[in-house]
């Protein structure tokens, strides 16, 4: 059963989905995939499953286990997950953490569901979720912007927008595939590409500058996203 107040035209035309129908009396898993500001409203519609053996699996950023236990009861099984958008092409990475009532079987069932769209990792504690959100949850947007910026830089050097974008996209996709398929660390892959006195070294001298390079900038980026995640969790 799928509850969606504003279903898309595509969703309306999928016959296999039971859309906005009466909920069953029992449910093995309830997946919560709504915006954080709408979460409490959504939870009121599924209170019948609270304090039962139903697993509440949330993929909403900033919605804490404490909040779910407050709304659903201390005897509810809560698993919080942070997926990312590459899940839409089965290349996602999802981190999960459960509350004290969560069993190994509950985690395995949730992992089996989430593994359908990529990889799943378990966290040691919920505090890690803010950093996870900043790295893998928001991370795809950083990469997309890198592609944009690389393509714009190519245009500035005289390439056509189409050619520069194709080169940039293929380069990021290829580099990502290489990191996935090789046993070498990204740092070694970087060294493999870098010839002494060559073009890559000239570029890396700027990117790897301790003060104005990419590393300090990325630290600021991840810190900002982590702080925002913590702020959302307190609302």
Predicted features, each with a name:
Residues 128-134, 186-191:
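Short pre-catalytic strand/loop immediately N-terminal to key active-site residues, enriched for Gly-Thr
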Residues 7-12, 17-96, 100:
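Rossmann-like NAD(P)(H) cofactor-binding subdomain of soluble oxidoreductases
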Residues 1-5:
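Conserved acidic E/D residue at the C-terminus of a beta-strand in Rossmann-like folds
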């Amino acid at each position: 059963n799928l509850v969606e107040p504003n279903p898309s035209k595509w969703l309306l035309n999928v016959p296999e989905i039971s859309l906005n129908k009466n909920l069953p009396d029992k449910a093995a898993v309830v997946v919560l995939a709504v915006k954080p500001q709408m979460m409490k409203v959504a939870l009121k519609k599924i209170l019948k499953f609270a304090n039962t053996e139903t697993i509440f699996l949330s993929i909403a950023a900033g919605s804490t286990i404490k909040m779910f236990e407050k709304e659903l009861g201390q005897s509810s099984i809560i698993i919080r997950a942070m997926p990312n958008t590459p899940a839409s092409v089965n290349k996602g990475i999802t981190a999960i953490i459960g509350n004290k009532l969560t069993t190994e079987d509950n985690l395995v069932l949730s992992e089996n569901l989430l593994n359908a769209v990529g990889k799943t990792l378990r966290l040691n504690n919920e505090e890690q979720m803010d950093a996870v959100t900043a790295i893998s949850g928001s991370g795809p947007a950083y990469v997309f912007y890198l592609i944009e910026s690389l393509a714009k830089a190519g245009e500035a050097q005289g390439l056509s927008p189409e050619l520069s974008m194709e080169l940039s996209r293929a380069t990021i996709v290829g580099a990502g595939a290489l990191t996935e398929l090789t046993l070498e660390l990204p740092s070694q892959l970087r060294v493999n590409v870098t010839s002494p006195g060559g073009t890559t070294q000239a570029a890396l001298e700027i990117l790897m500058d301790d003060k104005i390079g990419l590393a300090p900038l990325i630290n600021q980026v991840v810190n900002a996203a982590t702080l925002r995640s913590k702020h959302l969790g307190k609302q």
